[in-house]
Swiss-Prot record:
The gene is ruvB. GO terms for cellular component: cytoplasm; Holliday junction resolvase complex. NCBIfam families: PRK00080.1, ruvB. The RuvA-RuvB-RuvC complex processes Holliday junction (HJ) DNA during genetic recombination and DNA repair, while the RuvA-RuvB complex plays an important role in the rescue of blocked DNA replication forks via replication fork reversal (RFR). RuvA specifically binds to HJ cruciform DNA, conferring on it an open structure. The RuvB hexamer acts as an ATP-dependent pump, pulling dsDNA into and through the RuvAB complex. RuvB forms 2 homohexamers on either side of HJ DNA bound by 1 or 2 RuvA tetramers; 4 subunits per hexamer contact DNA at a time. It catalyses: ATP + H2O = ADP + phosphate + H(+). It is found in: Cytoplasm. Its main location: cytoplasm. GO terms for biological process: DNA recombination; DNA repair. Belongs to the RuvB family. Gene3D superfamilies: 1.10.8.60, P-loop containing nucleotide triphosphate hydrolases, Winged helix-like DNA-binding domain superfamily/Winged helix DNA-binding domain. Its EC number is 3.6.4.-. Residues 1-183 are annotated as: Large ATPase domain (RuvB-L). This is Holliday junction branch migration complex subunit RuvB.
Length: 345
């Protein structure tokens, strides 16, 4: 099973301390997502001017793009505290009530994976978001009674990688909604250069660009690759990260110029060599490469689809012309479902 991939956008347990050190603290230091930054700066300034809590904020998009970082920045810009939790952790209504009643006025409550909130907990959240009130039950059995508690005005920042799983009543209660997009190579180069400065590593523009190109449009991956390249530069070079040093380090780490690792290449080659490029069903593909359906669907496929190397069709997965050209292979003649992918050879 694919775990702890170097190019995985999911966070890893041993990265948290370093990630905290290199995360930007203010909007002016946040690279990329220009439209979102400009809008958030206006909303925050307006809320501060009125002395009110910022409207509730929903941030969605692929993992590793900076949702947690943005929640911390919002709190810093507002000059308030931020409390962190996640959907799976809030198992009971009382868990959420305890968090809400301990907030100070205008504090930020950050709920990661908010799409995984249970229905009972979500019901408690509705009046809290809308009216700054919650209903809690006191006692048990016939003597039980409901009391209404007033909450201080607060800002809920919800983050999710799967916005489509949010219920309409919850989604409609967010006044500010932003989707985070993948980053350009130029933006990632700036992020890598900034992180290198914070880590005390010397890096050239070419070195930063080389790391950025292989980072799959994702800052979390860029920072992870930078740390590994820094190790390589320290031991195998003079400590300075040049384009050549970064390239050699990443080749040794099995990350190619497209940001693909061994798992990506195995998936693509299996489709092309064993299934003639497809269409191939997900179950057959999972059995052929020894992975679970969910791993292919949620971990391996998204980036390959986004880059145009795999296409989902009603009949199954298909390797595109880009996939064949990437490996120096000749795309086969196609008919029917795949004619539009390969054209006439």
């Amino acid at each position: 099973m694919t775990t702890q991939r170097l190019v995985s956008a999911a966070g890893q347990w041993d990265e948290e301390a370093i990630d905290r050190a290199i995360r930007p603290k203010r909007l002016e230091d946040y690279v990329g997502q220009r439209a979102m930054r400009e809008q958030m700066a206006i909303f925050i300034q307006a809320a501060l001017g009125r002395g009110e809590a910022l409207d509730h904020v929903l941030i969605f998009g692929p993992p590793g793009l900076g949702k947690t970082t943005l929640a911390n920045i919002i709190a810093n810009e507002l000059g308030v505290n931020v409390r962190h939790t996640s959907g799976p952790v809030l198992e009971k209504a009382g868990d959420l009530a305890a968090l809400l009643t301990n907030l100070e006025p205008r504090d930020v409550l950050f709920i990661d994976e908010i799409h995984r909130l249970g229905a009972v907990v979500e019901e408690v959240l509705y009046p809290a978001m809308e009216d700054y009130q919650i209903d809690i039950m006191i006692g048990e059995g016939p003597a039980a009674r409901s009391i209404k508690l007033d909450l201080p005005p607060f800002t809920l920042v919800g983050a999710t990688t799967r916005a489509g799983l949010l219920t309409s009543p919850l989604r409609d209660r967010f006044g500010i909604v932003h989707r985070l997009e993948f980053y350009s190579v130029e933006e990632l180069s700036r992020i890598v250069a900034r992180s290198a400065r914070i880590l005390g590593s010397e890096i050239t523009p070419e070195g930063a660009a080389e790391v950025a190109r292989r980072s799959r449009g994702t800052p979390r991956i860029a920072n992870r690759l930078l740390r590994r390249v820094r190790d390589f530069a320290q031991v195998m070079a003079d400590g300075r990260i040049t384009g050549e040093v970064a390239g050699k380090a990443l080749e040794m780490l099995d990350v190619d110029p497209n940001g693909f690792d061994q798992s990506d290449r195995r998936l693509l080659l299996t489709m092309m060599e064993k299934f003639e490029g497809g269409p191939v069903g997900l179950d057959n593909l999972a059995a052929a490469i020894g992975e679970e359906r969910g791993t292919i669907e949620d971990v391996l496929e998204p980036y390959l689809i986004q880059q145009g190397f795999i296409m989902r069709t009603p009949r199954g997965r298909v390797a595109t012309r880009n996939a064949y050209l990437h490996f120096g292979l000749k795309p086969p003649q196609r008919t029917n479902v795949n004619e539009e992918l390969f054209g006439d050879e």
